[in-house]
UniProtKB/Swiss-Prot annotation:
Name this protein carries in UniProt: Putrescine N-methyltransferase 3
Record key words, sorted: Alkaloid metabolism, Methyltransferase, Polyamine biosynthesis, S-adenosyl-L-methionine, Transferase
Reactions mediated catalytically: putrescine + S-adenosyl-L-methionine = N-methylputrescine + S-adenosyl-L-homocysteine + H(+)
Similarity comment text for this entry: Belongs to the class I-like SAM-binding methyltransferase superfamily. Spermidine/spermine synthase family.
Swiss-Prot/TrEMBL GO biological process terms: alkaloid metabolic process; methylation; nicotine biosynthetic process; response to jasmonic acid; spermidine biosynthetic process
Entry comment describing in which tissues the protein is expressed: Mainly expressed in roots.
Its job: Involved in the biosynthesis of pyridine alkaloid natural products, leading mainly to the production of anabasine, anatabine, nicotine and nornicotine, effective deterrents against herbivores with antiparasitic and pesticide properties (neurotoxins); nornicotine serves as the precursor in the synthesis of the carcinogen compound N'-nitrosonornicotine (NNN). Methyltransferase that mediates the conversion of putrescine to N-methylputrescine.
Residues at which S-adenosyl-L-methionine binds: 130, 205, 236-237, 324
EC number(s) on file: 2.1.1.53
Pfam families reported for this sequence: Spermine_synt_N (PF17284), Spermine_synth (PF01564)
Active site (record annotation): 255
């Protein structure tokens, strides 16, 4: 594995055995604004609903009420201090904090929120780009949040990852060179390695803290960064694509944040033009494209931009993810002019035999050829707006 770093930060050891993170300290590090184009796998623009994490009751009588010390934790001046020395900043508004729960709020889904019960806080810190937190949940295993938004759950995020990889790669024959923008935790790479035809994978992740969290808490994923076919680049994904060799990649996967704030450029015409230039004739791109229940106005704008750039085909697909807002997420799938790409009928499906025999990975949990085809069947209200 080749690692190319554009970061120049120092190194600091965290309290309580937390991983070294380039000058960050749990809950107290300076958070520098001015994110570069959202290349890490996260959704921006959310308020942090950081919940109080209770690290074990004493003799069945511990209870935290009205900010009073109960022997196990103390809440003062916007922080929660625990026996083990961890200190959580309460980054959300006071009414978003529920004992033992994490809650996700955003202006993108006003009037609703999603909450998970916290069993154990594993890591919290601030990088140069975002707040990073990992906790063990009661229902979905490890949960990664960036800027207060759930990015991936260990036991519930596989539909998103399998679909963002296999919808595009299952639609072209023998993909060899692939670029992932974002994906620093490693789930997307894990799925991509199912394809024996792949010879080269470039991963561009802006936030080295995300990669460090993967190495510490997801070693089975981080191990794939050492695959000889993989090059991990720590830097700006949009700049990387712009500088890429013309016609180099068979596929580009944009595992990015929401199209607001620092990630806004990743959904606009100049970025798509750079992507199209970096793809071979008949090459494909797949990017996260929001929820039809909340963001039809955003989806319509993304489609309009893609139709101006990609002269092959432009398609919208969707799937279900239990821990994302409204329980669904969408994808834009586009191809460049050249050999025809029919996204709705996979020609390179990853079935159980391929998975078990060739890639030596566990069988897929969500994706199959029927799910692939069904992903492009839209409800009437969405279809009429998208096809107009």
């Amino acid at each position: 594995m080749e690692v190319i770093s554009t970061n120049t930060n120092g190194s600091t050891i965290f309290k309580n055995g937390a991983i070294p993170m380039n000058g960050y300290q749990n809950g107290t590090s300076k958070h520098q604004n001015g994110h570069q184009n959202g290349t890490s796998e996260h959704r921006n623009g959310h308020q942090n609903g950081i919940s109080e994490h209770q690290n074990g009751h004493k003799n069945g009588t511990s209870e935290h009420q009205n900010g009073h010390q109960n022997g196990t934790s103390e809440q003062q001046n916007g922080t929660i201090s625990h026996d083990n020395g961890n200190e959580l900043q309460l980054l959300g508004s006071s009414n978003s904090i529920k004992p033992g729960w994490f809650s996700e709020f955003s202006a993108l889904w006003p009037g609703e929120a999603f909450s998970l019960k916290v069993e154990k806080l594993l890591f919290q810190g601030k990088s140069d780009y975002q707040d990073v937190m990992l906790f063990e949940s009661a229902t979905y295993g490890k949960v990664l949040t960036l800027d207060g938004a759930i990015q991936h759950t260990e036991n519930g995020g596989f539909p998103y990852t399998e679909m963002i990889v296999h919808l595009p790669l299952g639609s072209i024959p023998n993909p060899k060179k692939v670029l992932i923008i974002g994906g620093g935790i490693g789930f997307t790479l894990f799925e991509m390695l199912r394809y024996p035809s792949i010879e080269k994978i470039d991963i561009v992740e802006i936030d080295d803290v995300v990669v460090d969290v993967s190495r510490k808490f997801f070693p089975y994923l981080a191990a794939n960064f050492n695959d000889p076919r993989v090059t991990l680049v720590l830097g700006d994904g949009a700049a990387f694509v712009k500088a890429a060799q013309a016609g180099y990649y068979d596929a580009i996967i944009v595992d990015s944040s929401d199209p607001i704030g620092p990630a806004k450029d990743l959904f606009e015409r100049p970025f798509f033009e750079a992507v199209a230039k970096a793809l071979r004739p008949g090459g494909v791109v797949c990017t996260q494209a929001e929820s039809i229940w909340l963001h039809m106005h955003i989806i319509k704008q993304i489609i309009a931009n893609c139709r101006q750039v990609f002269k092959g085909s432009v398609n919208y697909a969707w799937t279900t993810v239990p821990t994302y807002p409204t329980g669904v997420i969408g994808y834009m799938l586009c191809s460049t002019e050249g050999p025809e790409v029919d996204f709705k009928n996979p020609i390179n499906p990853i079935d159980k035999e391929t998975t078990q025999v060739k890639s030596k990975l566990a069988p897929l949990k969500f994706y199959n050829s029927d799910i692939h085809k069904a992903a492009f069947i839209l409800p009437s209200f969405a279809r009429s707006m998208i096809e107009s």
